[in-house]
Amino acid sequence: TVSPSLINLNNGGVSPAPKTVQEAMKRYFDYSNEAPSYYMWRILDQGREPLRKNLANVAGCSPEEIAINRNSSEGLETIIFGLQLKAGDEVVASLQDYPNMINAYKQREMRDGIKMKWINLELPSEDEDYLVRQYVNVFTTKTKVVHITHIINWNGQILPVKKIANEAHKRGIEVIVDGAHSFAHFDFKIPDLDCDYFAASLHKWLYAPIGTGVLYVKKEKIKTIYPLFATNENPLKDDIRKFENLGTRPFFIEQAITKAIEFHEMIGIERKEKRLHYLKNYWMEKVKDIPGVKLNTSLHPKWGCAIGNVGVEGKKPNELDSFLFTNYKIHTVAITWENIVGVRITPNVYTTTKNLDVLVEGIKAFVK
């Protein structure tokens, strides 16, 4: 059901849901409104446990480690504000992390006196030792937590999460992973990352309805985290469901996630990953040798998948972004964040090579 009037190359923000997902959401919405309090809580809410099992299957973990929420920011802030940190405890994070997470840590720093240790990554990078070293070099005996973004949203850089996590755990440091852009994007299971906490938005690469997310908490860690929304029971109880006390929520959206999982499994994660990487490299290979063009994303599958970023010397990102939309009706997003300057291009499985040929034509015309 994608728009025929423009070429959407900003799927990294929110991906369109397949028609089957949209139809399920509308059907559940109509159903809810027949008698809201009855159908929402007594009928639709009964589908949460089967949904939890289905999400756990995609994640490769126990259903008792999966909480269903609204987006990755909510999931990550549940952990950031729920961790029992005290004044002087150190947290390591990157300036390339997502702004909501940076702001959350700054708020804890202001309110609770924790100490933030910020690293600044030079990207793109295919040097695993360099990337791991940037984190490890700032670990101290006071470091309690390291926050790692699996895929940097600004340019699509994949970080070696497991290597960093291994080094952190050797030192007794807990590991939080921002998986907003990695979950259902390429082939991995959450336990493979050796992290303690992981959160993702399902409306990105799982193609679920807008406003759906998942939070993973390693089983033995659940009892150590306070929920973001209070419960009427012990907040440190050993039950993942304590993180779902959101009050009235859109059950019709939540239950349509199942159709997104079916669509995802129909494609298959291996085939999906190959398709997404192919599309990214298709356009990047065609523009990389144009004078003045700078690629801000690796072409190697270990370090990038669907998300790419391109800059043009002497031009601001918003100039290229505006040019592409005004002249070619291509929707992208201009990025100027720390040392990443360019336009983010994010195709999806439905994107055609003809769409990307138009993009290449537009970049060539802009450079002239």
Language model features with spans:
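Pyridoxal 5′-phosphate
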Residues: 1-368
